Amino acid sequence: MRHYEIVFMVHPDQSEQVPGMIERYSATITNAQGQIHRLEDWGRRQLAYPINKLHKAHYVLMNVEAPQEVIDELETNFRFNDAVIRSMIMRVKHAVTEASPMVKAKDERRSRDYSLEDANMDAEEAGDSEE
């Protein structure tokens, strides 16, 4: 079986359907003895340019190992699902399991925000103890 990287973008008004779509597509892959190496829900993000007069979309990234028939079925599902506004399936040489740069940047921002909150809390506590 070959390794693939799949990215699909969902209409922002259909964001509540994304978990169900992920579950359905994951089941399609695993039922055909495929494996999902990485699954990331990037959430709603700004588009680089408008697509169908939309400026935002809900992004999902999957790295999978699956037979070609499953990939063809996924591609057909993407094409006929009106909620999916764009999709891209690329073949890659090996399984990618590490976090994507999008998730790494989000984690760094989150840890930086927590460290700033901790510093503010420490400063407030120091101010309270001086009084």
From Swiss-Prot:
Residues 100-131 are annotated as: Disordered. One of its GO terms (molecular function) is structural constituent of ribosome. Keywords: Ribonucleoprotein, Ribosomal protein, RNA-binding, rRNA-binding. Residues 119-131 have a biased composition (Acidic residues). Disulfide bonds: none annotated. GO terms for cellular component: cytosolic small ribosomal subunit. Transmembrane segments: none annotated. GO terms for biological process: translation. Pfam families: Ribosomal_S6. Residues 104-115 have a biased composition (Basic and acidic residues). Signal peptide: none annotated. Binds together with bS18 to 16S ribosomal RNA. Belongs to the bacterial ribosomal protein bS6 family. This is Small ribosomal subunit protein bS6.
